[in-house]
Amino acid sequence: LTFWRWVTAVIVLIPFVWKDVRDNLDLVRRHWKIYLAQGTFMVGGGTLLFTSLNFTTAINASLVNTTQPAVTALLTWIILKDRLKNIQYVGIASAIVGVVFMIAKADLAVLINLELNIGDFIVIFAILSYSMYAINLRKLPPGLGTFPTLFVILFFGTFPLLPFYIGETILVGPVPFL
């Protein structure tokens, strides 16, 4: 289903972006690797988040997902060596403390007896994927508008999903649309 979700998004965008993308095909060809990486991070994050819901609760996934801005800021600091402002450190700390407080329901015993499952870890990988997408946005070349760039990223993002879609279709059967 994820594969078709992204293919549908690509198809819907075509009439609005085709001329701009066609006029900038040389730019897209020269920078295909960053578009593929961005597509993989964007589509991967969404796919992992939805996959996690097969194993964990929506509440757990939502709580862990609230750390997204903090993780993005931390990765920007670690990978890109960007300096963070004091207010960002405060924001990161408060996000982490807030999530821990909510998960624990203000009860230390809950944290001590916390049982994580595979779905919780998949959410973490989804967050990491989204964060990598966010911090690599600055690597995108100038020249395409917002929607043409989104189109190209989504277009390239469907390719990493294709083997999984084919495998699922062979092993489980085609995805019902209705």
For each feature predicted by the language model, list its residue ranges.
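Juxtamembrane helix-entry segments on the extracytoplasmic side of multipass membrane proteins
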Residues: 2-3, 26-32, 104-129, 166-178
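Hydrophobic transmembrane alpha-helices of multi-pass small-molecule transport proteins
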Residues: 13, 36, 75, 84-106, ...
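Transmembrane alpha-helical segments that form core, pore/gating elements
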Residues: 13, 72-74, 78, 111-169
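Specific alpha-helical transmembrane segments that line the substrate/conduction pathway
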Residues: 1-11, 42, 50-83
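Loop-to-transmembrane alpha-helix entry segments
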Residues: 29, 65, 81-101, 116-117, ...
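Specific transmembrane alpha-helical segments of multi-pass solute transporters/efflux pumps
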Residues: 18-65, 101, 178
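Hydrophobic residues within membrane-embedded alpha-helical segments of Major Facilitator Superfamily
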Residues: 8, 41-42, 48, 64, ...
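Juxtamembrane helix-start motifs in multi-pass secondary transporters
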Residues: 1, 87, 146-150
